């Protein structure tokens, strides 16, 4: 007997007013029927709601900040350990890759993989880049900016991921 398992009512949004996005970065969290047919979910079941509020840590969305002194990337990688992550800089791009093999979780077995690529500003000092992973799974990539008259090096190199013992609070805009 096939039984459809519905997502809990408190995790549903207001249909077309706040539609879900199929390509949101939920690493292996699974798809629901409203992800595939968002326009039908509110017409088939008017009481069917998706969550209105998703925090940065729950959504896996990255945040990029670039101010006068530094360039910072925050990325939620809570399902990955530092050994599962590879961060490298090549030319004007930073590439963050995460992959872990199949492992057991509460619902069965799962494997995850992602690849993100960000363009670095031309005035970031690539020789002083750092990357750390907090206890709550927030990856922080940081690079100081140099004065505009100096030239930055653009050779490919790997950036080691260090582990922090304290959790990182969600980045605020």
Curated annotation (Swiss-Prot):
Heteropolymer composed of three CRYAA and one CRYAB subunits. Inter-subunit bridging via zinc ions enhances stability, which is crucial as there is no protein turn over in the lens. Can also form homodimers and homotetramers (dimers of dimers) which serve as the building blocks of homooligomers. Within homooligomers, the zinc-binding motif is created from residues of 3 different molecules. His-100 and Glu-102 from one molecule are ligands of the zinc ion, and His-107 and His-154 residues from additional molecules complete the site with tetrahedral coordination geometry. It is found in: Cytoplasm; Nucleus. This is Alpha-crystallin A chain. Expressed in the eye lens (at protein level). Zn(2+) 1 binds at residues 100, 102. Changing residue 116 to C: In CTRCT9; zonular central nuclear cataract; reduced chaperone-like activity and increased membrane-binding capacity. Zn(2+) 3 binds at residue 154. Changing residue 71 to L: In CTRCT9; uncertain significance; reduced chaperone-like activity in vitro. Contributes to the transparency and refractive index of the lens. In its oxidized form (absence of intramolecular disulfide bond), acts as a chaperone, preventing aggregation of various proteins under a wide range of stress conditions. Required for the correct formation of lens intermediate filaments as part of a complex composed of BFSP1, BFSP2 and CRYAA. Residues 1-63 are annotated as: Required for complex formation with BFSP1 and BFSP2. InterPro entries: A-crystallin/Hsp20_dom, Alpha-crystallin/HSP_16, Alpha-crystallin/sHSP_animal, Alpha-crystallin_N, HSP20-like_chaperone.
